[in-house]
A protein has these predicted regions:
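Terminal-proximal interaction/regulatory segments of ATP-powered molecular machines
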Residues: 1-104, 111-148
């Protein structure tokens, strides 16, 4: 399971599911039949494309937290369901993504101080290439770009 998340990651996310299923199946089936299950999971993991973008992203985010680079939650994302919240600007100007034609609001959710962080740096390995394109599209929509 560690290999599936740490070394394969988003390049082939299904390998994590196979790893978990294999661990559970081995516990249920036992040896000698479990060797087939283990071989199945091992072969899938060894043949899968590799990416450590998840490891790098969480590492960069944790470094920012440790250095105190965390910022503040934008006012429009703060709870507005208590007396006095509106006077503080909480919840005002929030754009509901479901009301947007693209399903993505032209609004950021990170603190201002972290907008340039770019934690997720996708590779072009396996399925991660497609996820990188999705992340780029979402970023552009959140910045208010029209993608027509």
């Amino acid at each position: 399971m560690i290999l599936a998340s740490e070394d394969i990651g988003l390049a082939a996310s299904g390998v994590l599911l196979t790893s978990v299923a294999a661990a559970q199946s081995v516990a249920l089936v036992g040896m000698p039949e479990a060797q087939i299950i283990l071989a199945h999971a091992t072969l899938e993991a060894s043949l899968a494309p590799k990416s450590n973008s998840v490891v790098k992203a969480i590492g960069a985010a944790m470094t920012d937290v440790q250095r105190g680079r965390v910022g503040t939650v934008p006012a429009y994302l703060r709870d507005a369901h208590y007396p006095g919240a509106s006077e503080l600007g909480h919840g005002q100007n929030y754009l509901y993504p479901h009301d947007e034609p693209s399903g993505v609001a032209p609004q950021t959710y990170l603190p201002e101080e972290l907008l340039d962080a770019g934690y997720f740096q996708p590779t072009n390995h396996g399925a991660e290439e497609r996820l990188g394109a999705v992340a780029d599209r979402l970023r552009r929509l959140r910045q208010g770009e029209s993608l027509d």
